[in-house]
Regions:
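Glycan-recognition and catalytic cores of secretory/periplasmic carbohydrate-active enzymes
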Residues: 2-31, 36, 43, 48-715
Length: 715
């Protein structure tokens, strides 16, 4: 790996002034075309012809080039530069403006275009742009393609006026389209160099199957709903064709139960849901409408073997061909607590779609067994034995191996339209436990930190926070409001002081997560951050503090907020993770504060600047966020497409696309609808063992619960 790579001249002295993400994507796009100079005269002539034809309201200009043609892209680029409109040349596209903010056809400007002066200005602008952008020296500025109903939009047409600023209005639609272009660059590279592979290595431009033959569809299935949300119909059809002809789960291959559930099962279920919900996504062949659901059911039936443990807690992995579950090959054979308890959204939605109670029963049995352990203050150790249903060790953290247990508590409550209050009760208990035992403040700037207890609740406080923890601030806001705007939530009769405090906690934790980005040389967050605390540490349970810094300025001599962060070499890698931008999406939609969008835009620019791969390889995770340029790890995570870019696209888009009060995202960002479980006669099939005033299980009730837990759940 060449750590000094600079394929787009991004790191020369002149470029250290942080070029925008648009300009960087444009430079990447420049490498994909070669006909701009030769097409200059043709573009001018085509423009003249379009002017002459403008009297015909529905006339298509003569000599319309193919949408794939560089001439077409060049013409659209020129048109957008001259008119200031992001659309391509008029009458080239047939897609009208639709819902969810999808862009439509261009509107004519016939009054201006009929004049000779207008024609002359356009021709002059064409030549001026050629000189300004350096096309006369052999460069191009053509941009990336969109879907087949919306092609011809050059990237350059999207960068005009996009940067915004304090004195100008930000064009969030242009920023959203920039995210779409980043996705297309990533997807196009994968299509060209790694199609069908479960792993894609953008630097070496190779891939690898997780299972032979044809793999698991790890990247394709995980990205399905992002393709749908971005309305990329051409790319979606390619993916659908591959799934139809090549995806087969009848493999003698052991797979991780959790990862396969959240990525593959979740991706297929979400694709089925969105195909029925968003316009224009159903396949042309009606016989293929249930294909995603059929694949999901086949996969789920194979995963059922993982739940056939003595306790009901799923085995860490399962062999797909025969459905045989297997214990973890590490951690003393124990399963990850988060992995065992983050399967419920997927299984419950599948049960609702199919009417098959077995999926519901298996999923909720896990929750009962885990809760029957009576973890103190709702804080669970991060490992659990599948055969015994008891915890291994007492390490507590909301990061790796703990995170999504807490996430799925409140999301289960919301998924079934608040019909299962037991999960809200468990969420509240766990959040209060975190406030009591884990929440602390940094020494200098009082940033709020969710620390860890490696030796249990009574052990020492470890000032470490995984990036994975950054799901929490958005989830707190979601739990507090139910996903409706804050202004509406405050009108609810249940709103009070506690809810205001929780929203403030969400704001402060979001700020800490953003600090993980702003503190590094690249503007990308490390995998893990450590923090400077007081000795003894100030705790949230004794006093609620507001951070002293706005993260935009720092005090010299190391006394500012940056000195509160300690990024260790072993933790300095960035894996393109989505947790922070997920929280930004929730915080923006719930509070309406533009700062969360602005922070998201800064993150996106940093990803584009520092993780883009030369020769149209796409984007890669990096090894050190404090090195410029950061060494590339030569891997594109599937959640870069499934989560990170999806959340950014939604963050910059309209709020009525996947409203937070109508859907829940699983932990892989696959959206599921909230549904009325009672319509399928589903309900919670278990009850919690009562706790005493100290939060301990009532002994006499434990025996009763043990006796009933061995009986099948009746729904």
């Amino acid at each position: 790996m060449n750590s000094t790579r600079d394929p787009f001249n991004l790191r020369s002295k002149a470029s250290l002034t942080a070029p925008s993400a648009f300009s960087l994507l444009q430079n990447a796009a420049n490498k994909t075309a070669s006909q701009a100079v030769e097409s200059t005269k043709q573009a001018v002539e085509a423009t003249k012809q379009a002017i002459q034809d403008s009297d015909m309201s529905f006339a298509i200009p003569r000599n319309v080039p193919n949408f794939e043609n560089a001439q077409r892209k060049f013409e659209d680029n020129v048109w957008s530069k001259v008119t200031g409109n992001e659309q391509g040349l008029p009458m080239y596209k047939d897609k009208p403006t639709g819902g969810y903010g999808y862009s439509g056809g261009a509107k004519g400007r016939r009054g201006f275009m009929r004049s000779k002066r207008g024609m002359g200005l356009i021709a002059l602008a064409v030549l001026g742009l050629i000189y300004w952008l350096g096309w006369s020296r052999g460069g191009t500025a053509i941009g990336l393609e969109s879907d087949e109903k919306d092609r011809g939009k050059s990237l350059a047409s999207k960068i005009s006026g996009s940067a915004g600023g304090k004195k100008s209005k930000v064009d969030w639609e242009k920023r959203r389209l920039a995210v779409k272009d980043a996705f297309l660059l990533s997807w196009g590279a994968y299509e060209e160099h790694g199609w069908g592979y479960d792993e894609y290595h953008p630097v070496s431009k190779t891939g690898r199957y997780m299972a032979e033959p044809n793999g698991m569809g790890w990247i394709i299935v995980d990205a399905l709903d992002t393709l749908m949300i971005m309305n990329l119909t051409k790319e979606l059809n390619h993916a659908r064709q591959w799934i139809t002809t090549s995806l087969d789960y009848d493999k003698k291959q052991d797979v991780n139960t959790f990862e396969t559930t959240i990525r593959m099962l979740g991706g297929l279920l979400s694709a089925h849901y969105l195909q029925e919900t968003l316009p224009g996504l159903k396949p042309e062949n009606a016989n293929e409408e249930d294909m995603f659901l059929e694949k999901a059911t086949d996969l789920a039936d194979r995963l059922m073997g993982a739940y056939e443990s003595p306790s009901g807690v799923p085995w860490a992995s399962v062999i797909l061909k025969d459905g045989k579950g297997e214990a973890s090959h590490a951690d003393g054979g124990a399963s990850s607590t988060a992995e065992a308890t983050s399967l419920q959204l997927e299984m419950k939605f599948l049960a609702y779609l199919t009417g098959e109670a077995v999926y519901w029963e298996k999923a909720e049995k896990v929750m009962q067994v885990v809760d029957n352990n009576g973890a103190k203050d709702g804080l669970l150790p991060i490992f659990i034995y599948a055969d015994r249903g008891t915890f291994r060790g007492n390490e507590i953290r909301w990061g790796s191996r703990g995170d999504s247990y807490y996430e799925y508590l409140i999301k289960q409550y919301l998924q079934t339209q608040k019909q299962e209050p037991v999960y809200q009760e468990m969420w509240n208990e766990s959040l209060n436990g975190a406030k009591k035992h884990l929440l602390t403040y940094t020494k200098n700037s009082h940033l709020t930190v969710l620390a860890e207890r490696p030796d249990g609740i009574e052990g020492h406080l470890h000032p470490k926070m995984d990036h994975l923890v950054c799901f929490l601030p958005g989830t707190i806001a979601l739990a507090t409001t139910g996903g409706i705007p804050l202004a509406e939530a405050r009108k609810q009769p249940t709103w009070g002081k506690q809810q205001e405090e929780d929203m403030q906690l969400a704001r402060e934790l979001t700020k800490t997560c953003i600090g993980m980005y702003k503190v590094t040389a690249t503007g990308l967050a490390p995998e893990i951050a450590h923090f400077e605390l007081d000795d003894p540490p100030k705790m949230y349970r004794t006093e609620v503090l507001a951070s002293k810094s706005n993260l935009e300025t720092d005090i010299p001599e190391g006394e500012g907020w940056k000195s509160d962060f300690n990024i260790k070499q072993a933790d300095a890698h960035n894996l393109q993770r989505p947790e922070t931008v997920e929280s930004l999406l929730y915080m923006w939609r719930i509070t309406g504060d533009d700062i969360y969008r602005e922070w998201g835009w800064e993150m996106f620019q940093a990803f584009v600047k520092h993780t883009i791969v030369e020769d149209n390889g796409g984007f890669s995770s990096v090894s050190n966020v404090n090195t410029i340029p950061p060494p590339l790890r030569d891997n594109m995570e599937s959640f870069w497409l499934a989560e990170t870019l999806k959340y950014m696209y939604l963050l910059f888009g309209p709020n009525d696309l996947l409203p937070l009060d109508q859907i829940v995202f699983n932990t892989e960002a696959h959206p599921f609808p909230r549904f009325d479980a009672s319509k399928k006669r589903f309900k919670t099939g278990w009850e919690r063992i009562p706790r005493d005033e100290k939060g301990n299980l009532v002994p006499e009730k434990v025996e009763e619960a043990t006796a009933t837990a061995s009986k099948p759940t009746s729904i």
